[in-house]
Amino acid sequence: MANIGIFFGTDTGKTRKIAKMIHKQLGELADAPVNINRTTLDDFMAYPVLLLGTPTLGDGQL
């Protein structure tokens, strides 16, 4: 298991695309991105470092 977990939420797929780009740059340091809808607390706790990607609406509102 890698040291970095990448988790994302997406409405249109753009956040997933960015998560995959980040994963590619980090290589073996990070596991493959996971949609937060398929995640449990134990999944988060498995990593010492988390990267969380969230979608925005309109002009960047969360």
From Swiss-Prot:
Residues 4-62 form the Flavodoxin-like domain. PROSITE patterns: FLAVODOXIN, FLAVODOXIN_LIKE. Its cofactor is FMN. It comes from the Bacteria. The keyword Electron transport applies. GO terms for molecular function: electron transfer activity; FMN binding. The keyword Transmembrane helix does not apply. SUPFAM superfamilies: Flavoproteins. Signal peptide: none annotated. Gene3D superfamilies: 3.40.50.360. InterPro entries: Flavodoxin, Flavodoxin/NO_synth, Flavodoxin_CS, Flavoprotein-like_sf. GO terms for biological process: nitrogen fixation. Keywords: Electron transport, Flavoprotein, FMN, Nitrogen fixation, Transport. PANTHER family: FLAVODOXIN 1, FLAVODOXIN 2. Belongs to the flavodoxin family. Low-potential electron donor to a number of redox enzymes. NifF is the electron donor to nitrogenase. This is Flavodoxin. The lineage of its organism: Bacteria, Pseudomonadati, Pseudomonadota, Gammaproteobacteria, Enterobacterales.
